[in-house]
């Protein structure tokens, strides 16, 4: 899998139906490719987090 493929190691979902899930991963310099609302710090390297709310979790990045 490429590093740009959407994936998430730390995903949390609500128990509602449909669930509301978000990824808490911190990535360097960019968010995953499927992220629409990405926020990054101004540090070098930048630490970025995706703030999208989805009804599923992406597959884990590691393993």
Curated annotation (Swiss-Prot):
Site-annotated residues for Reactive bond for trypsin: 14-15
Annotated SUPFAM superfamilies: Bowman-Birk inhibitor, BBI
InterPro entries: Bowman-Birk_prot_inh (IPR035995), Prot_inh_BBI (IPR000877)
Spans traversing the lipid bilayer: none
Site residues (Reactive bond for chymotrypsin), renumbered to this chain: 41-42
A single cellular component GO annotation: extracellular region
Domain of life: Eukaryota
GO terms for MF: serine-type endopeptidase inhibitor activity
Disulfide links within the chain: 7-61, 8-23, 11-57, 13-21, 31-38, 35-50, 40-48
Keywords from the UniProt entry: Disulfide bond, Protease inhibitor, Serine protease inhibitor
Family statement drawn from the similarity comment of this UniProt entry: Belongs to the Bowman-Birk serine protease inhibitor family.
Complex and partners: Exists as a dimer in its native form.
Function: Inhibits trypsin, chymotrypsin, plasmin and factor XIIa. Does not inhibit factor Xa, thrombin, human plasma kallikrein, porcine pancreatic kallikrein and human urinary kallikrein.
Protein name: Bowman-birk type proteinase inhibitor 2
Species, as recorded: Amburana cearensis (Cerejeira)
